[in-house]
Swiss-Prot record:
Source species: Bunolagus monticularis (Riverine rabbit)
Biological function: Component of the ubiquinol-cytochrome c reductase complex (complex III or cytochrome b-c1 complex) that is part of the mitochondrial respiratory chain. The b-c1 complex mediates electron transfer from ubiquinol to cytochrome c. Contributes to the generation of a proton gradient across the mitochondrial membrane that is then used for ATP synthesis.
Name this polypeptide is given: Cytochrome b
Subunit field text: The cytochrome bc1 complex contains 11 subunits: 3 respiratory subunits (MT-CYB, CYC1 and UQCRFS1), 2 core proteins (UQCRC1 and UQCRC2) and 6 low-molecular weight proteins (UQCRH/QCR6, UQCRB/QCR7, UQCRQ/QCR8, UQCR10/QCR9, UQCR11/QCR10 and a cleavage product of UQCRFS1). This cytochrome bc1 complex then forms a dimer.
BP GO annotations: mitochondrial electron transport, ubiquinol to cytochrome c
Example of a GO cellular component annotation carried by this entry: mitochondrial inner membrane
Binding site for heme b b566: 97, 196
Gene (UniProt): MT-CYB
Major localization listed first in the record, in broad terms: mitochondrion
Length: 379
């Protein structure tokens, strides 16, 4: 008798995706982040569900409901901090996952890559709206500043902002709708993840060498299930270290002050994972220009596959491109640091230089380096 996992209509899908899936024999730990992102999403949905059982999305009670969760609900503090720091782990894994895609040329799987970009935008939107929910000072002013950016859109801008707010300022209507969107988006993300995997399984995984690996495949289970399990243990350990020892390390102290529309915090800044984009936004003195640069800083990922001039897929054997890639990583870390600094000399100049460098590396220097490498290799 054939094994049920190979015949049952539902189990067959799971079997072909997680058990009998042919996988390249040489994929490194950089291929662990996909499954880690899946784990992050599950942690976020579960902790979020339990938080939603006690949270109230009303401006008068939102802040105190979060306090109530931390003080009075059984292990409420644990659920809340797992959710808040789980978001940080989510973004660490996301950026590593995208970085892996750029380094090893995985972006040549166009459908998978484009769904991935949509997923990135969806996760960023979800995280932004989630940050508004505790209704602290940074929640309120972050929501005000970021939604206000849409007013830079010519002609319809102001109307659009007031439509999103549901009034003439960030208020009860805004908080309620943000909670509704924050609740529904993770399930949309989960559906998109299915599509992401569907497209990935059409082609199979890439590998560090960038060379087709059809002649050398191994079953996903047990080899990569055990490897993923190790990744899970390491990430959960890191998350628990953060949650149990310094849960507020990555947060903003201003968010422990209830939202007050009459009192603006001295430095309005988003969570650490948005600081690089925030620095790019601030580096341009013009409002519309800044907004366009902000959107382009992420949307530029969609252009990367069309700028691939190398005859090789991966950067594994391309030292010039490798150097540029790591300069890009250092540049993003610089932008992250600048995003958290006040708008004054020398930070303004550093931010502008780093922003120009970010776009230059991706749009000009990397394609040029690839052409030079082709020439050196006489291709």
């Amino acid at each position: 008798m054939t094994n049920i996992r190979k015949t049952h209509p539902l189990l067959k899908i799971i079997n072909h995706s997680l058990i009998d899936l042919p996988a390249p024999s040489n994929i490194s730990a950089w291929w662990n982040f996909g499954s880690l992102l899946g784990l992050c999403l599950m942690i976020q949905i579960l902790t979020g569900l339990f938080l939603a059982m006690h949270y109230t999305s009303d401006t008068t009670t939102a802040f105190s409901s979060v306090t109530h969760i931390c003080r009075d609900v059984n292990y409420g503090w644990l659920i809340r901090y797992l959710h808040a720091n789980g978001a940080s782990m989510f973004f660490i894994c996301l950026y590593m996952h995208v970085g892996r895609g750029i380094y090893y040329g995985s972006y040549t799987y166009l459908e998978t890559w484009n769904i991935g970009i949509i997923l990135l935008f969806a996760v960023m939107a979800t995280a932004f709206m989630g940050y508004v929910l505790p209704w602290g000072q940074m929640s309120f002013w972050g929501a005000t500043v970021i939604t206000n950016l849409l007013s830079a859109i010519p002609y319809i801008g102001t109307t659009l902002v007031e439509w999103i707010w549901g009034g003439f300022s960030v208020d009860k209507a805004t908080l309620t709708r943000f909670f509704a969107f924050h609740f529904i988006l993770p399930f949309i993300i989960a559906a998109l993840v299915m599509v992401h995997l569907l497209f990935l399984h059409e082609t199979g995984s890439n590998n560090p060498s960038g060379i087709p690996s059809d002649s050398d495949k191994i079953p996903f289970h047990p080899y990569y299930t055990i490897k993923d399990a190790l990744g899970f243990i390491m990430m959960i350990l890191l998350l628990l270290l953060l949650v149990l020892f310094s849960p507020d390390l990555l947060g903003d102290p201003d968010n422990y002050t209830p939202a007050n529309p009459l009192n603006t915090p001295p430095h309005i800044k988003p969570e650490w994972y948005f600081l690089f984009a925030y620095a790019i936004l601030r580096s341009i003195p013009n409002k519309l220009g800044g907004v366009l640069a902000l959107v382009m800083s992420i949307l530029i990922l969609a252009i990367i596959p069309f700028l691939h001039t190398s005859k090789q897929r991966s950067m594994m054997f391309r030292p010039l491109s490798q150097i540029l890639f790591w300069i890009l990583v250092a540049d993003l870390l610089t932008l992250t640091w600048i995003g958290g600094q006040p708008v004054e000399h020398p930070f303004i100049t550093i931010g502008q230089v780093a922003s120009i460098l970010y776009f230059s590396i991706i749009l000009v220097l990397m394609p040029l380096a690839s052409l030079i490498e082709n020439k050196i290799l006489k291709w």
